[in-house]
Amino acid sequence: MSNNGVNALPATGDLCDLTIVGGGPTGIFAAFQCGMNNMSCRIIESMPQLGGQLTALYPEKHIYDVAAFNEVQASGLVDSLWTQAGRYNPEVVLNDQAVSFKKLDDGSFVVMSAAGASFRSRALLIAAGLGAFTPRTLPQLGDVSHLEGSSLFYSVTSRNDFEGKRVVIVGGGDSALDWTMGLLPLAERVTVVHRMASFQGHGKTAHEVLDAREDGKIEVHFNTEVASLETSGSCLRRVCTRSKSGHEEVIDADCLLLLIGFKSNLGPIAQWGLELQDNAIVVDNQMKTSVDGLYAAGDIASYPGKLKIIQTGLSDATMAVRHSLSYIKPGEKIRHQFSSVKMAKEKK
């Protein structure tokens, strides 16, 4: 999703009900929930566009486990979320990172940004996903920066990059399997290299990949790692592999797609004095952190039984916004209003 149509406003410093740190699916849906609860809000997003990982890493990936969508492209889901939230005109600050916060004597919060702006709100919600993320690389390849973006990729942002190409995909998780099948109709040839003896991704997709292998449509090399690359300038020529048994093979290739995961880093949020567990923020059943009035939702929130999927993040956002309203208006009975009733009133 580009920021076209997004009301990306400059820092105003005006007091709003809720500041949302993070503009991924959870953060966008939290903004919608604010509108549903007649709350003003702002989103602070460090990237130049909303959508989080869906926009930055997987805009053309298809998603199948979001309610009511049999199949939806990641960028399309972000667009739909923004269409839903945008009707309430939330303030959106792009290309700026929340670096610290201060809780004032009156219970409100001030968030300070990397650009030197200050944002004040009555409550605070962190929906920053996994934090900052960098792709895992293969150290044995050395400096490959000259190949990145031309023949070496860590995600698929445009299928066209691989059309008619001989593609080697490294990995055995969900992303590797999804893109093996996703690029199969476009690429001249797809070869999968995986260091383990079996795939770790979703069973259904794994079977599809193995069936394609049986049909001779793709090659799969288990117990094998990439040992080195043969290149010419910024162009990849061959991928040299070595199996655990010592067998070496040279694969002609135009593109190398490393889908072996990302390293996440909470960044400045890790220094905010919140209770953390496994690089995530501990919350209670109201999505409240160890600081009263400060909430967390989505992948960055940790609680027993948590599943890090989009659907859960949307639920987290709903809970967090709802309970933040109780913090903002202590002692006031918060009544639930069905969306159909609210929308009918808005249309009058």
UniProtKB/Swiss-Prot annotation:
Protein residues bound to FAD: T26, E45, Q53, Y58, A98, F133, D299, S340
Keywords for this protein: FAD, Flavoprotein, NADP, Oxidoreductase
Keyword Flavoprotein on entry: yes
Enzyme Commission (EC) number: 1.18.1.2
Catalysed reaction equations from the record: 2 reduced [2Fe-2S]-[ferredoxin] + NADP(+) + H(+) = 2 oxidized [2Fe-2S]-[ferredoxin] + NADPH
Gene3D superfamilies: FAD/NAD(P)-binding domain
Cofactor note: Binds 1 FAD per subunit.
Domain of life of the native organism: Bacteria
Signal peptide bounds: none
Alphabetized InterPro entries for the sequence: FAD/NAD-bd_sf, FAD/NAD-binding_dom, Fd--NADP_Rdtase_type_2, Ferredoxin-NADP_redctase_2
Pfam families: Pyr_redox_2
Cofactor(s) this protein requires: FAD
Disulphide connectivity of cysteines: none
Any GO molecular function: flavin adenine dinucleotide binding
Uppermost EC category: oxidoreductase
Database matches in PANTHER family: THIOREDOXIN REDUCTASE 1-RELATED-RELATED (PTHR48105)
Subunit structure of this chain's protein: Homodimer.
Family the UniProt entry places it in: Belongs to the ferredoxin--NADP reductase type 2 family.
Protein name, entry field: Ferredoxin--NADP reductase
